[in-house]
């Protein structure tokens, strides 16, 4: 009810300042009686995926709560799962500002944040304090100053630390804002990374006596051949799930709009059709051998249904949440 007014005020601010302001308010509410201000009840629509039981199929995509500061307040809004991160072994400030832009007419966002986060140890402390009753995913990446050839070490460091606290772990090899990162999606580099991650998962499973599934997050900007190769690698290495998709470098759908020439990844409605097409193609290739978490431009019940019809078992929102507010969560979960 009140979100249009809140949005109008927030959209007067620079996007990153609006984000920081919102998170300051959410942190003040978290764990207090005032948390009811952001709480809403949504129907329970259980889904079993990656060996986990989700209370509903709608999650928050990584990138909004990078450091796990507002898990409880966001959880109170009705998400079945929340993915925090992307987090890296060491804290890093990310790219220079401004680095986040609203494409208001297209209901899209361009970001070149660059994995700004306070580091994996800080994230874990925040996760320990949270009481979220849903599934918590932790999205991990590599530090900007770690050479790509040594990138897998950063993923293994993060895995080692987050494993006891994660419902699932997401491997981000598809952000366009860390130089060279997307090269880890291809050929031998991907096989080498997935083999190391699977070995680490086996070791941690034995050490902690619990199995934490691993999902790999891929880009939308892949050729047919690359998509087929990735699907093959994921199956061969027994990866538990795939998150499709991250942001796009393609600007064809926002030509002529304000900020369309800004560098970074484009998300929101302009990504909707492309991400759904990647999910559909991936689903045909995987033949149910591992589940797909669908993300990219979901801003309505119809868009959510399209992702699931294309082959997604679970779905996530981010930009649609910014443009439509918490009401979108209730709407999707109720009518999906």
UniProtKB/Swiss-Prot annotation:
Known cofactor(s): FMN
Query: What GO molecular function annotations does the UniProt record carry, in alphabetical order?
Result: dihydroorotate dehydrogenase (quinone) activity
Q: Does the keyword Phosphoprotein apply?
A: no
**Reactions it catalyzes:** (S)-dihydroorotate + a quinone = orotate + a quinol
What Pfam family is a match for this entry? DHO_dh
Q: What is its main location?
A: membrane
**Residues at the catalytic site:** 175
What are the binding positions for substrate in this chain?
Answer: 66, 111-115, 172, 177, 246-247
Localization? Cell membrane
Q: Which UniProt keywords apply?
A: Cell membrane, Flavoprotein, FMN, Membrane, Oxidoreductase, Pyrimidine biosynthesis
Q: Which residues form a coiled coil?
A: none
Tell me which InterPro entries the record gives: Aldolase_TIM, DHO_dehydrogenase, Dihydroorotate_DH_1_2, Dihydroorotate_DH_2, Dihydroorotate_DH_cat, Dihydroorotate_DH_CS
The note describing how and how many cofactors are bound reads: Binds 1 FMN per subunit.
Subunit composition and interactions: Monomer.
- What job does this protein perform? Catalyzes the conversion of dihydroorotate to orotate with quinone as electron acceptor.
NCBIfam families assigned = PRK05286.1-1, PRK05286.1-2, PRK05286.1-4, PRK05286.2-5, pyrD_sub2
This one is known as Dihydroorotate dehydrogenase (quinone)
Gene label: pyrD
């Amino acid at each position: 009810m009140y979100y249009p007014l809140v949005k109008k005020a927030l959209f007067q601010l620079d996007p990153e300042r609006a984000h920081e302001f919102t998170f300051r308010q959410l942190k003040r509410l978290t764990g207090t009686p005032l948390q009811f201000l952001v709480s809403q009840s949504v129907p329970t629509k259980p889904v079993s995926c990656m060996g986990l039981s989700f209370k509903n199929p709608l999650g928050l995509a990584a990138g909004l709560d990078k450091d796990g500061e507002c898990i409880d307040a966001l959880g109170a809004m009705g998400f079945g799962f929340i993915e925090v991160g992307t987090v890296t072994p060491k804290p890093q400030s990310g790219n220079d500002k401004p680095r986040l832009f609203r494409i208001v007419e297209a209901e899209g966002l361009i970001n070149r944040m660059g994995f700004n986060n306070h580091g994996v140890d800080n994230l874990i402390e925040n996760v320990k304090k949270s009481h979220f009753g849903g599934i918590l995913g932790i999205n991990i990446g590599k530090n900007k100053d770690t050479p790509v050839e040594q990138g897998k070490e950063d993923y293994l460091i993060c895995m080692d630390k987050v494993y006891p606290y994660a419902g699932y772990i997401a491997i981000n090899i598809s952000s366009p804002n860390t130089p060279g990162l997307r090269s880890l999606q291809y050929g031998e580099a991907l096989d080498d990374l997935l083999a190391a991650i699977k070995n680490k998962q086996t070791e941690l499973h034995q050490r902690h006596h619990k199995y934490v599934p691993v999902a790999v997050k891929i880009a939308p900007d892949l050729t047919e051949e690359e998509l087929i190769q990735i699907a093959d690698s994921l199956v061969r290495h027994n990866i538990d799930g795939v998150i499709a998709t991250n942001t796009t470098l393609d600007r064809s759908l926002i030509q002529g709009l304000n900020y369309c020439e800004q560098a970074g990844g484009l998300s929101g409605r302009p990504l909707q059709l492309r991400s759904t097409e990647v999910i559909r193609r991936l689903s045909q290739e995987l033949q149910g051998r591992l589940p797909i978490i669908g993300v990219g431009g979901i801003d309505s019940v119809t868009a959510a249904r399209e992702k699931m019809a294309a082959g997604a078992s679970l779905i996530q929102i981010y930009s649609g949440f910014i443009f439509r507010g918490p009401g979108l969560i209730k709407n999707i979960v109720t009518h999906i």
